[in-house]
Amino acid sequence: MEFLPEPQHPPGPPTMDLEEPKGPEVPSEDHPSNTQWALGPRGPDTLSEMELDTSSVRALVQQLEALPSDLGGQFPDGAPCPLHIATGQGLATQENLDAGGLLSAEAGGDNLLGLLRCEASLPAQSVPPDPAQAAPRLLQPPEDPGGDPGWMEGTEPADNRSSSSSPELWLETAPLVTHRDPPVGTQSQETLASCPAVSEVPGPCGQEELMDGVLFGAKYLGSTQLLSERNPPPSTRMGQAQEAMDRVKAPEGETQPMTEVDIFISTKRVKVLAADSQDALMDHALQTISYIADIGPVLVLMARRRLAKRTTSQDRQRQLYKMLCHVFHSEDAQLIAQAIGQAFSIAYSQFLQENRIDPSQVGMQPSASASHPHNGDLDHFCNSQNCREVCIQKRPGEGLGVALVESGWGSLLPTAVIANLLHGGPAERCGALSIGDRVTAINGTSLVGLSLAACQAAVREVRRHSSVTLSIIHCPPVTTAVIHRPHVREQLGFCVENGIICSLLRGSAAERGGVRVGHRIIEVNGQSVVAMPHARIIQLLTETREIHIKTMPAATYRLLTGQEQPVYL
């Protein structure tokens, strides 16, 4: 390396301030960036005293060679060196700089750490930065408006800066990995494992199919509206379904207008879609479906709608609801009704699993309805308020003034039933007896299991007493029996002749439901059959899977209708 000859200095000093700065060596605002700096260990007081001999030049060259190679050039086209920015070299004059020198003893450790991080992230000098790519954004740009704005490529105004914080002191970069919170509805594997599994619900459709939704073809006949309470008894529901069908369905012999539709059933909703365009004609949430009745090929779908708030106290207590009854015709009416019932069961099982409820704790047993069928007599017998002791005061030798009939074969409590009361007699005067009451004992003597003749003889024996105590169970004269069948092909288990039940099959669905021999059928599914032909009664009994029958003893019916004269005891 050649050494340059010693420079010849002018006799006078240059016009510059060479006073040694008390702080860090920072370029002055009045001098350009190419001003020479004293690099020796001790700078001379004046420029005339600085003599560069050969040894000083060699020391200067060694110090230059010791500097990093990447500081030798400027970056006119790209971003400046962060080290130059930190030391104030290589840029235009800055107004405010750090009070502590970066390489001095009192320099902050944070600044040094940030500088090292910036040096590690510098791009190679040979590869110019791509303007299309977003360059790192400097948090402390130079404040000189006249400086070269080329280094600010890739920056954006302060108002558009990202709100995400960066650990770097000098650079703000986008995070490589974004931590996202799990969705609200997600659950961990441990949580799902602790929930009871959804049991398989029997039905005509697969469980996954119903969760996605299944379609059934049908013919839409029409709709009507009914007013109803929120939870009427099943017999009332069946009567409402029969009334809706009678309103919509055309009489026999007349043309029935109908439209081809598809019934969409899922665990969330029940929709009626147009068969050609698949447009939703009706859409009901599953929880609003109140009742489904399949009456032969006719399907009645009943959806509940809450009415506006009533002002009167009577309407407020009743809480009436509007029932939207849709009537369809389909050969698969029974299958559609079963599918809707299966959707209810699956939705209930999902609700239990999501809330981590054990089905055994809420009595969710598949055969609960079969093991405990509805029986009108059983409801009255289980109510302790219906069991009474009635004391009748009368003259000795006077009869009680009651007419008794048998309860019927197959009754849960075989005993005598009060069929009529003598007007003005002792039984009517006491005011505690009514038609339909079961007499279980008289003066402490049980009548349960005795024949009708034995019960009548026991009542005649107390004529000589002035006070008679009867043990009764209060029951209405008309009782309700509910028969459940898995399908309409299963036999009912009883025979009917002229509206009177004449025989009963032991262990059949009719016996479990409360049907009794010797009773007269009054209503079937809410429809009166008193004056109905025998063939029509048989049709009503055989066209549905669930039958609600109201009956009363045939002898009581004949007495109340005047067909027979009562014999008072």
UniProtKB/Swiss-Prot annotation:
Main location: cytoplasm
PROSITE patterns tied to this protein: PDZ, PID
SUPFAM superfamilies noted in UniProt: PDZ domain-like, PH domain-like
Transmembrane segments: none
InterPro entries: APP-Binding, PDZ, PDZ_sf, PH-like_dom_sf, PTB/PI_dom
GO biological process, one term: protein transport
Subunit text: Binds to the cytoplasmic domain of amyloid protein (APP). Interacts with HIF1AN (via N-terminus). Interacts with NECAB3; seems to mediate the interaction between NECAB3 and HIF1AN.
Domain topic, free-text comment: Composed of an N-terminal domain, a middle phosphotyrosine-binding domain (PID/PTB) that mediates binding with the cytoplasmic domain of the amyloid-beta precursor protein, and two C-terminal PDZ domains thought to attach proteins to the plasma membrane.
PANTHER family per record: AMYLOID-BETA A4 PRECURSOR PROTEIN-BINDING FAMILY A MEMBER 3 (PTHR12345:SF9), SYNTENIN RELATED (PTHR12345)
Job of this protein: May modulate processing of the amyloid-beta precursor protein (APP) and hence formation of APP-beta. May enhance the activity of HIF1A in macrophages by inhibiting the activity of HIF1AN.
Official protein name in the record: Amyloid-beta A4 precursor protein-binding family A member 3
